[in-house]
């Protein structure tokens, strides 16, 4: 956690109000603020996972090299411009055993509020994968800063 994010959050939420705080009281208040910041950040991360989704995605194998290419669309159903969104594709055998994972960035730009962004991917070896799943990952710094600034409560 960035000290700056915790301090912004603590100040904004009133943890550091008053000018009679001793060093020990400040440390205790910052610790309390840190716990609340983490709790709220986890809620925001869950909100993003539920409201920023991959749709219309597919993949196909090359029979000769066991490689895969695919594409998809990320829908941002939030009011936030979201930077640095990454995807992780997990390839599995018929019995559900994982073979490999691959990942990358959806885009180097932000995904606009209520916008969509298409992406494509290539994985050099997936063996005899019969199915795959995909998930998105969001930038921790973006999540903490958004919560610290009070843009998500």
Task: Please report, for each region that a protein language model flagged, where it lies by residue.
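Short proline/glycine- and polar residue-rich coil/turn motifs
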Residues: 107-116
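Low-complexity, acidic Ser/Thr/Pro/Gly-rich terminal tails and inter-domain linkers that flank the onset
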Residues: 30-71, 152
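Terminal connector regions
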Residues: 34-40, 101, 121-153
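Short aromatic-acidic-glycine turn motif
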Residues: 91-101
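Asparagine-centered strand-capping/turn motif at beta-strand->loop junctions
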Residues: 74-78
């Amino acid at each position: 956690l960035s000290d700056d994010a915790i301090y912004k959050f603590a100040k904004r939420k009133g943890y550091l109000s008053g000018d009679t705080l001793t060093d020990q009281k400040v440390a205790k208040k910052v610790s309390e603020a840190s716990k609340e910041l983490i709790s709220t950040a986890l809620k925001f991360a869950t909100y993003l996972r539920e409201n920023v989704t991959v749709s219309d995605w597919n993949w196909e194998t090359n029979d000769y090299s066991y490689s895969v290419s695919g594409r998809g669309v990320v829908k941002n159903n939030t009011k936030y411009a979201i930077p640095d969104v990454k995807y992780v594709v997990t390839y599995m055998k018929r019995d559900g055993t994982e073979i490999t994972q691959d990942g990358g960035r959806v885009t180097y730009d932000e995904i606009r509020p209520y916008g969509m962004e298409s992406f494509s991917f290539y994985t050099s070896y997936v063996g005899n994968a019969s199915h795959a799943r995909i998930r998105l990952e969001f930038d921790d710094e973006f999540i903490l800063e958004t919560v610290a600034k009070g843009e998500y409560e």
